[in-house]
């Protein structure tokens, strides 16, 4: 790469860093937390956690059918 290309990349990077540093994450995170997708993910996570807790407390479920005896 030549010097001009590197200089352009440097300036673009500095502009991006400046924009990121001036960005307020609090309002962004609040919007993300209240989004429909986040609500669906949280409800799915809660359901999976409840299922896991029930499996741990109740032990593994018994198999529905016992293995059949082998014929000789």
Swiss-Prot record:
Coiled coil: none
One of the record's GO molecular function terms: peptidase inhibitor activity
Subcellular location: Secreted
Pro-piece positions: 70-72
Any single biological process term in GO: regulation of blood pressure
Secretion signal span: 1-22
Cellular compartments per GO CC: extracellular region
Similarity comment text for this entry: Belongs to the non-disulfide-bridged peptide (NDBP) superfamily. Long chain multifunctional peptide (group 2) family.
Reported function: Amphipathic peptide that shows bradykinin potentiating activity and antimicrobial activities against bacteria and fungi. Has higher antibacterial activities against Gram-negative than against Gram-positive bacteria. Also inhibits NADPH oxidase-dependent superoxide production (IC(50) is 0.4 uM on granulocytes stimulated with PMA, IC(50) is 0.51 uM on HL-60 cells undifferentiated and IC(50) is 0.53 uM on HL-60 cells treated with DMSO). The C-terminal peptide shows a higher bradykinin potentiating activity than the complete peptide.
Protein name per Swiss-Prot or TrEMBL: Bradykinin-potentiating peptide NDBP6
Organism, as annotated: Lychas mucronatus
Upper lineage: Eukaryota, Metazoa, Ecdysozoa, Arthropoda, Chelicerata
